[in-house]
Amino acid sequence: MAKDGVIEVEGQVVEALPNAMFRVELENKHIVLATISGKMRKNYIRILPQDRVVLEMSPYDLNRGRITYRYK
């Protein structure tokens, strides 16, 4: 359920950083800085390096994103 104007892409977590930030490598080898969405944080969904995730990115800043789903 993405918002209008939001870009959804898939990637793989490369590195876990402090303050629930992650470096994610997209399928096109671009690396972005991502945070966890509020619903994932509320439900205590853990994200580790090598996890496949779905990101929402704003068209205005393509270097940051929000992790909205973790594949099992």
UniProtKB/Swiss-Prot annotation:
- The chain's disulfide connectivity reads none
* Record-linked Gene3D superfamilies: Nucleic acid-binding proteins (2.40.50.140)
Instruction: Give the Gene Ontology MF terms in alphabetical order.
Output: ribosome binding; rRNA binding; translation initiation factor activity
Identify the residues that the record assigns to the S1-like domain, covering every copy: 1-72
**Main location per the UniProt record:** cytoplasm
Give yes or no: UniProt keyword Protein biosynthesis.
yes
Cellular component GO terms, alphabetical: cytosol
Q: Which residues form the signal peptide?
A: none
Which key words are in the record? Answer: Cytoplasm, Initiation factor, Protein biosynthesis, RNA-binding, rRNA-binding
Which family, according to the similarity comment? Belongs to the IF-1 family.
* Name the record gives this protein: Translation initiation factor IF-1
Q: What is the lineage of its organism?
A: Bacteria, Bacillati, Actinomycetota, Actinomycetes, Bifidobacteriales
